[in-house]
A protein has these predicted regions:
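Active-site loop ensemble at the mouth of alpha/beta enzyme cores that anchors a bound cofactor
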Residues: 72-76, 126-130, 134-173, 185-208
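His/Asp/Glu-enriched, well-ordered alpha-helical/loop segment
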Residues: 77-104, 173-179, 184-215
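Electropositive phosphate-/nucleotide-binding environments in soluble metabolic enzymes
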Residues: 10, 38-41, 86-94, 111, ...
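Binuclear metal-ion centers of metallo-dependent hydrolases, dominated by the metallo-beta-lactamase
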Residues: 110-120, 124
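Glycine-enriched alpha-helix->loop->beta-strand junction motifs that scaffold or abut catalytic
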Residues: 18-25, 51-54, 101-103, 124-129, ...
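Histidine/acidic-residue-rich, glycine-tolerant segments that coordinate divalent metal ions
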Residues: 1-99, 116, 137-140
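Divalent metal-coordination and catalytic microenvironments
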Residues: 25, 58, 107, 131, ...
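Short catalytic-loop micro-motif centered on adjacent basic/acidic residues
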Residues: 1-2, 106-111
């Protein structure tokens, strides 16, 4: 399991080195499901400085998320990738790579979604690893939102085919390090709420293997 990083516990992370069952530190650079968030660069820097394990990062830029909230359209899940833009993702990923390299620490970028991240991370493979999810390799906008509505809502979001194609380029050229599930199921009654009150995420653990084998 991951240990959740916060601004308040950043100074204590070195003590986790021998913690049994802890595979790494989880850092939310952008707000998602739940209330874990380390958004400020000084706090992110402190997490990496004190971490004795790999830091796995939900990589979205909180400042851009907040600035883009005005782009959310009530009842229209198509606005989800407009709010949580590709700029939001690559801005955060560049910052995480810079901080990890500064401290010579290992970072794992979770569930990347953009062509910009594929191109950037292909040039920063040292201590930086990253994953792609089956859902981002299977469906893309706008069709996914047309057909599935809020069932296709996740963070970071499903994007258009240009991003989908570049993610597959990464897989075919062995640029990504792993396939990750980003397992985040919700009750049907909640997923069917009107956007943006619907929660982000979908199941992944039980579907990762058959979906990827089918590809």
């Amino acid at each position: 399991f991951y240990f959740g990083a916060t601004a308040d516990n950043a100074n204590d992370l070195a003590s986790l080195k021998g913690l049994e069952g802890c595979c790494g530190i989880k850092l939310f650079a952008g707000s998602s499901t739940g209330n874990l968030l380390v958004a400020e660069e000084d706090d992110i820097d402190k997490v990496f400085q004190n971490s004795s394990k790999v830091v796995a990062v939900h990589s979205e830029d909180e400042a851009i998320l907040n600035a883009n909230k005005k782009l959310i359209k009530d009842g229209d899940v198509h606005s989800h990738p407009v709010w949580r833009s590709s700029e939001c993702a690559i801005s955060s990923t560049r910052r995480i790579a810079r901080i990890a390299e500064r401290h010579n620490k290992k970072a794992h970028i979770l569930h990347i979604t953009t062509k910009e991240e594929i191109d950037f991370l292909s040039q920063h493979k040292g201590n930086i690893t990253f994953e792609i999810t089956p859902q981002h390799l299977t469906i893309y906008a706008p069709d996914c939102y047309d057909k599935l509505g809020t069932y296709a809502q996740m963070n970071p979001p499903l994007r258009d085919k240009s991003h989908y194609d570049r993610l597959w380029y990464g897989v075919r050229n062995n640029i990504n390090d792993t396939i990750g599930s980003d397992h985040a199921p919700h009750l049907k009654v909640n997923k069917e709420k009107s956007y943006p009150n619907s929660p982000s995420g979908m199941p992944g653990v039980q579907t990762l293997m058959p979906v990827m084998l089918n590809h």
